[in-house]
Amino acid sequence: MHIRMVGTGSAFAKKFDNNNALLEQDGCCLLIDCGITLPKALYQMGLAFPEIDAVLISHIHADHVGGLEEFAFQMMFKYNRKPVLFIADTLIEPLWEHTLRGGLTQDPLNKLEHFFDVRPIIANTETELFPGLRVKLLPTKHIPNKPSYSFLFNDRFFYSADMRFDKELLLRLADGGVQTIFHDCQLEEPGVVHASLNELLTLPESVQKKTWLMHYGDTIDQYQGRTGHMRIVEPQRRYEV
């Protein structure tokens, strides 16, 4: 299993594009989140939407779903395909009603299912996405009263998406066999809706060595050598996980 970050930036970062990723397993390509900058960033990588087999959404914020309108329109009108959308059952209605409906609706096309092959996922239940690729959606805290999910792939790779620091969860995952953690990281205090670097630095050395930092701000270069045993994910670089 390999991952390439299309972007590694925080919601307000201007240098690194939205924190979205391509996860590859046995010839299948899963897009993890589809933010505002995703269409352009994907193009700059020399890739196009038809090369994506499915998209998996973590929560409803523009840097994670803001590119879905263009994705849907391109696939429908340019490529005559309905892309597969893996999504928590709790996110289906808010994604359509609060984010996509205004831009995508053109009668008689007025449902999410008109644009995507919607595959609902129930949280905390392991689901096979492709042969050899399984995911478990873990409800995590990000914004109060707003559902948000992190992803556990094949019981060994944890992808936080956006979440507040949860030391207990990270220790439990590491003890349970997780080998690699890609975690969002807010560089400056306080970490209100994301884990801060200082919070992540409280993790044991053994867990830090498994942890890679993503979803960071434009000042990340100032933090080189200041991240303990954790490493910084580089955009567009391919990692085995």
Curated annotation (Swiss-Prot):
Keyword Transmembrane attached: no
InterPro entries: Anti-Pycsar_Apyc1 (IPR056308), Metallo-B-lactamas (IPR001279), RibonucZ/Hydroxyglut_hydro (IPR036866)
Cofactor annotation remark: Coordinates 2 Zn(2+) ions. One protomer coordinates the metal ions and the opposing protomer provides the catalytic residues required for cCMP hydrolysis.
Keywords tagged on the record: Hydrolase, Metal-binding, Zinc
Reactions performed catalytically: 3',5'-cyclic CMP + H2O = CMP + H(+); 3',5'-cyclic UMP + H2O = UMP + H(+)
Binding sites annotated in the UniProt record for Zn(2+) 1: D63, H64, D162, H215
PANTHER family for this protein: HYDROLASE C777.06C-RELATED, HYDROLASE C777.06C-RELATED-RELATED
Job description of the protein: Counteracts the endogenous Pycsar antiviral defense system. Phosphodiesterase that enables metal-dependent hydrolysis of host cyclic nucleotide Pycsar defense signals such as cCMP and cUMP.
Note: This homolog of an antiviral immune evasion nuclease may be due to cryptic prophages, or it may play a role in regulating the endogenous antiviral defense system based on cyclic nucleotides.
Subunit structure: Homodimer.
Protein name (Swiss-Prot/TrEMBL): Anti-Pycsar protein Apyc1
Organism of derivation: Paenibacillus harenae
